[in-house]
Amino acid sequence: MLEEKLNELKKKLIEEAGLAEDMVKKSIEGLIEKRKEILEKVVKKYEPKMNELEIELDEFCTNLIALYQPEAGNLRTILMILKMNNDLERIGDLAVNISESALFLIERPPVKPLIDIPRMAEEAINMLKNAVDSFINKDTKLAKSVCQKDAVVDNLRDQILRELITYMSSDPSTIERSIHLIRISRSIERIADLSTNICEDVIFITEGKVIKHHKDES
């Protein structure tokens, strides 16, 4: 019976992860293609759905623990899903941040060509997808490869920040737009960080090895 409930729980998590991934993809798509309707859909339709799923999963986990009092591996799995649930909801919030800044930017002239942000987003989306796959398949090799990708996203963020500081210094009229681009790049970076957190948890639950978090989660 518990095994059936755990499988049901994992299906709910996969649904939530799919929504989180879709929210990030749509927020970037709306920015690149300047499509207001896509961005508004992320904010007005997808976010409420994400919040519903987060609450549903949280209650499901709490009820499982109360009813079945799981031990050892099963308890660790439920606790990890609780944490992943929180991380995925935060990724949804970050996609909303991206969409809100994108809604501001698409109505104004571009500060710079959008080259690095789509690259950065592609890396982060792949990290998220692989993080969830590593959990489903208990694939620590895949989880470790995701952790290594985090540096790529960080480097792109630093490059974007340096460029935007140069733009703002030379032309103060770009400051407000540049700040929104910085907000987008930092949101993408946090998505990559949260995906890495998921992978660290996969490694712990599968191998029993604690991988120290490389960054604060502020």
Describe each region flagged by the PLM.
Residues 1-218:
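Cytosolic, long alpha-helical scaffolding segments
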